[in-house]
Amino acid sequence: MKHLKKQTLILLSIASLLLVGLAVFAHIHKKEEKTSYSNLNSKASLNEVRSILSKHLDKGSVDNFINLVRDYNDTVGSVGLSGDFAPFTKTDYDVEKISSLWTAKHGDFIGTNCRINTYTLLKGKIKIPQVKSDTELLFQDKDAIDKGKLFDAKDQENFEILFSRVKTEATQDVKVHAKHMEDYYKQFTFDDKARMLSVVVHDNLDGDSLFVGHVGVLVPMTDGYLFVEKLTFEEPYQAIKFASKKDCYKYLTTKYKDYTGPGLAKPFIMDNGKWVDMD
């Protein structure tokens, strides 16, 4: 009887271990499955993203963003852009062909970039102080806004303040630069749900300064997070589903790690007005 009881306990222990192992595997597998992306080049993906964004952003802002996406994808969508969400792997876009198609339709209007699209989405959710801006590095943005008639005078002023160049020190210490960005953004009031994730770049061509080199919008979903971005003026929109904020931080940190040079600090991430310490 004792022997039978011992065998039963052993079998129960093995079964428990198997169940734990399966649960861990399922959790890992589920997390891996969550990282998926789309270039919004299908009606289904566009409607899904519109629905998610509309839960956290002003309807007019979302509509304007969707119109920009449609214009871009209607123009260059034939160049291998993805429609429905698919597993997220390294993306590679034919910029030369995209540029050719875009220019044929839009002439000298270069389109929109990450900053223009982020402001389009978040303009009703960020309280922007009326302070002096440094627009030295926004020359392409300003040209696009002017030629595309994208913003009125007030929106352009707020856009330039949000993405102003920020003075810093001649150091490679990211903590020093992050403090300067945090001090600048203390003047702003950001939204807790629709978050602005920025990749901040150190530049010293005309004195040491900090600049939002890339930016996108992160919003919560029922199970995870959605990050939307326009990669560059030429490169497409990406909507990426992440399991966690940290996964999105890692994506941005890895993708833009080489946006630096001799004597410069490495790029760093800001979540709204706070530095994300990845070390």
Q: What would you call each of these model-derived segments?
A:
Residues 1-7:
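Positively charged n-region of N-terminal signal peptides that target proteins for export
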Residues 8-10, 16-279:
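Cysteine-nucleophile amide-bond enzymes
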